[in-house]
């Protein structure tokens, strides 16, 4: 069975963390992108579990570097740019408040 690409918006919150736990045991989805406001300090640990991640987005950061990630999106339009570059991926929105509606 071909795995579906998945983008996880809001990886640092409780819904995002529960999703990451579930994805570790799942063979239907391949996590290819994660997004958060500013929680950059968690990325390396997530990359250890999900080396399939090629895209990371932070709407609240203006600079971030990580040699393990192919595509890094920053700023106000970071989430939209990541979605546009990963056409066809399933999007799981775990963002809270108004950020989840934008």
Name what the model sees in each region.
Residues 1-98:
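N-terminal glycine-/serine-/threonine-rich beta1-alpha1-beta2 phosphate-ribose binding loop
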Residues 101-102:
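Glycine-rich phosphate-binding loop at the start of an alpha helix
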């Amino acid at each position: 069975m071909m795995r579906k690409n998945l983008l996880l918006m809001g990886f640092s919150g409780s819904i995002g963390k529960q999703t990451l736990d579930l994805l570790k045991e799942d063979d239907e989805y391949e996590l290819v992108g994660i997004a958060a406001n500013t929680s950059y300090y968690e990325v390396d640990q997530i990359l250890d579990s999900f080396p399939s991640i090629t895209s990371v987005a932070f709407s609240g950061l203006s600079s971030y570097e990580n040699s393990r990630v192919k595509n890094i999106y920053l700023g106000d339009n970071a989430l939209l740019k990541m979605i546009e570059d990963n056409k066809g991926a399933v999007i799981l929105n775990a963002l809270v408040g108004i950020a989840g509606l934008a």
